[in-house]
Amino acid sequence: MLAFCRSSLKSKKYFIILLALAAIAGLGTHAAWSSNGLPRIDNKTLARLAQQHPVVVLFRHAERCDRSTNQCLSDKTGITVKGTQDARELGNAFSADIPDFDLYSSNTVRTIQSATWFSAGKKLTVDKRLLQCGNEIYSAIKDLQSKAPDKNIVIFTHNHCMTYIAKNKRDAIFKPDYLDGLVMHVEKGKVYLDGEFVNH
């Protein structure tokens, strides 16, 4: 019972810290909360959270070639040239505050290309489990985190996975656009959703 209380207090303490950081971030990012009810977490706030414990950031892939009139990078199942530019820009901004992270993607051309352009040369590990968008994705995240408990993780996945996580974890309606992100962490074998990543 005592252990449970301590765990509960720790979780509450962490959530209070997160709310405070989100409020501070909100002063410079128009609002501390997104319209979907998720806390907004920008680069600087994310860097502060990463000092508390490793973070897991999930991104939707960049602009799909087969659903755009923009020029394709290569394969029709991949992303557009604009998508590569957007992914590189996001990666540069992200890496400025979180330079050390392990990089993963699902086994589709669009997520692999997005992760590759985001990372600018960082080693990419492709994991087909990251295409599974039910409770299975939590098992995959916990497994990846257990391999390097002290490392931050970036995952390129799909909109339906992120929509599922937001609804399942916080009962939030989240319809991510290209390269939108969610911030999570793993604590004592459980996966927690901290909020929506906003690139500012």
UniProtKB/Swiss-Prot annotation:
Xref: Pfam families: His_Phos_1
Keyword Hydrolase: yes
Domain of life according to the entry: Bacteria
Molecular function as annotated in GO: phosphatase activity
Signal peptide: 1-25
GO cellular component, one term: periplasmic space
Assigned keywords, A-Z: Hydrolase, Periplasm, Signal
Pathway(s): Bacterial outer membrane biogenesis; lipopolysaccharide metabolism
BP-aspect Gene Ontology terms: lipopolysaccharide metabolic process
EC number: 3.1.3.-
Protein localization: Periplasm
Family designation: Belongs to the phosphoglycerate mutase family. Ais subfamily.
Purpose: Catalyzes the dephosphorylation of heptose(II) of the outer membrane lipopolysaccharide core.
Record's protein name: Lipopolysaccharide core heptose(II)-phosphate phosphatase
Originating species: Shigella flexneri serotype 5b (strain 8401)
Gene behind the chain: ais
